[in-house]
Amino acid sequence: MKRRSVLLSGVALSGTALANDSIFFSPLKYLGAEQQRSIDASRSLLDNLIPPSLPQYDNLAGKLARRAVLTSKKLVYVWTENFGNVKGVPMARSVPLGELPNVDWLLKTAGVIVELIVNFVASLPASAAAQFERIATGLSGDLEAARQVHEALLEEAKNDPAAAGSLLLRFTELQTRVIAILTRVGLLVDDILKSASNLVTQRGQGDGLNRFRAVFGTLRLPEVADSFRDDEAFAYWRVAGPNPLLIRRVDALPANFPLGEEQFRRVMGADDSLLEAAASRRLYLLDYAELGKLAPSGAVDKLLTGTGFAYAPIALFALGKDRARLLPVAIQCGQDPATHPMFVRPAESESDLYWGWQMAKTVVQVAEENYHEMFVHLAQTHLVSEAFCLATQRTLAPSHPLHVLLAPHFEGTLFINEGAARILLPSAGFIDVMFAAPIQDTQATAGGNRLGFDFYRGMLPESLKARNVDDPLALPDYPYRDDGLLVWNAIRQWAADYVAVYYASDGDVTADVELAAWVGEVIGSGKVAGFRPITGRSQLVEVLTMVIFTASAQHAAVNFPQPSMMTYAPAICAMSAAPAPDSPSGKSEADWLKMMPPTLVALEKVNIYHLLGSVYHGRLGDYRQTGFPYAPVFSDRRVTASGGPLERFQARLKEVEATIRTRNQARRRPYEYLLPSRIPASTNI
């Protein structure tokens, strides 16, 4: 009975945990948060009368006021390294009221949760679905009506800014209405848990892959469901998928990957060779050794999902001599060649090798999801931004120009990170169910990756150089690199223009005591590896570029592929239900299907990844306050004047958008995750 109950709680739409966790559904908290935002907005109106300034140029009264504000902030924004499920990682001890999400975010997120409820209900037997369909339809209608009221209030405030104050009462009524809808969402999930538990275990009992397709009731089955076994598509994941950060060019193969010349030529043709491919910069490698305990190799038994496996494979890819497309060459399913044989991509005529090859690719995809979710997504975006958010609030006064610039890039970050720690990472939580490794090892390994992430080496240009993939002549088709650099450079120019407004010289940088305190907190309390004192304007620009890019574009690139690329379990999953293949030949489709995860894992993947990848809140370049009526953040005419830094940044983003859309017309598959119009300003989901 316990297993069945937890099974349904896993099914219940990632909204189950949300609905039953007070951090998401606490009316008093949200009302208090809006009151706090109103207070902050009032302060902002006063602050707007005086342009932001560096502390060294403030008068005595101003310096005392700054010190008082920061003293109070430090009582609210408190560091801890003992937050549950992410111990050792610097986090906020609790989420301050002003950091809770606003009505706009709640409406968007609630809409996605209801969409997931409808999807789940649609795949229940008709007799059980009827009552839930009626309630879910009503919730959808109420949410749409609330959205329309929200849009109408914003339009009124836009047309008559002076009336914004008088609209606050109606906005408060809307907020109460939205909270009531969220409460009903929670009740509906509870009802599903109570009434449908005996039906859930009957779901997805079709043959082959049918059970994985069955979890898409009303949600559109992603295109990857029909293409994931294709070798070219498998290779394209490395340059345009959710984890485009691991592939690197190599001049020679590692000693523990003994692919022979004859094997290479079987794949790439008799007129090619390993030596020639290496010399002409056409060899590319994935090595998942860094997974460590995320890849236990042996069987791991869990109550809810049975036996699971994950490995640390090595995979070789190569370009043909025409450099037209990247293709997989060979896979070794673990680090030791003595225990893991080499799998070489078979020709169409080698049918006896087909399913062994598919099994080896599944091993790679299991490693890929582990690496993506725990490292490049959670550790290197969410948890890195957490440190900069706390340091900014604790050391930069609200009147500091860098606080004004950076705060919008941290909207929602503390809140969503606490949610991740509480809901995704506990024992029997989403990650424990979906991933093979014991949850304690998963938590520790993800935390270790965050603490080991080097800030300067992680900068996009440096990361590309370190992996030898920065040259488009060597690797022509790398959408993440090409589009990412466009966005990086636009942000860098914006940071340079902004810094020039307030810092006249390098001396202004070194004389800024609040900036020095910020650096000290990032290094000391934030434990950001590689971070160091900032001694000049050019270095400050690079630092700001990295902070903003990480919170916005980098998170977008690794988060928003999830619904289209990661919800279909056979395409990618963080555990397999059977061990890696022991031989390239003699395998069947039945052997490959045994590697597919339990239906529970497939259900949880749909729910959590669709939710995380479907909420777009805020937009890069659109700097607005979090409280109604979401007024502009910047008031300094040196920043906002026509033709000034902000307008130039927004114009550059439009140019980047146009360039990417033009590129997508020529690409085999559009790469849309770094379109500026689809990049939220902060890591808020």
Swiss-Prot record:
It is found in: Periplasm; Secreted. It comes from the Bacteria. It is an enzyme of class 1 (oxidoreductase). Its main location: periplasm. Pathway: Lipid metabolism; fatty acid metabolism. It holds the Pfam family Lipoxygenase. Residues 1-19 form the signal peptide. Binds 1 Fe cation per subunit. Its EC number is 1.13.11.-, 1.13.11.33. Its cofactor is Fe cation. Keywords: Dioxygenase, Fatty acid metabolism, Iron, Lipid metabolism, Metal-binding, Oxidoreductase, Periplasm, Secreted, Signal. The keyword Secreted applies. GO terms for biological process: fatty acid metabolic process; lipid oxidation. It catalyses: (8Z,11Z,14Z)-eicosatrienoate + O2 = (15S)-hydroperoxy-(8Z,11Z,13E)-eicosatrienoate; (4Z,7Z,10Z,13Z,16Z,19Z)-docosahexaenoate + O2 = (17S)-hydroperoxy-(4Z,7Z,10Z,13Z,15E,19Z)-docosahexaenoate; (5Z,8Z,11Z,14Z)-eicosatetraenoate + O2 = (15S)-hydroperoxy-(5Z,8Z,11Z,13E)-eicosatetraenoate; (9Z,12Z)-octadecadienoate + O2 = (13S)-hydroperoxy-(9Z,11E)-octadecadienoate. Mg(2+) binds at E133. Fe cation binds at H377, H382, H555, N559, I685. Belongs to the lipoxygenase family. Exhibits lipoxin synthase activity as part of a bacterial evasion strategy to suppress the host immune defense. Oxygenates polyenoic fatty acids including eicosatrienoate and docosahexaenoate to the corresponding (n-6)S-hydroperoxy derivatives. In turn, this production of bioactive lipid mediators promotes bacterial persistence in host lung tissues by inhibiting the expression of major chemokines and recruitment of leukocytes. PANTHER family: LIPOXYGENASE (PTHR11771). This is Lipoxygenase LoxA. The lineage of its organism: Bacteria, Pseudomonadati, Pseudomonadota, Gammaproteobacteria, Pseudomonadales.
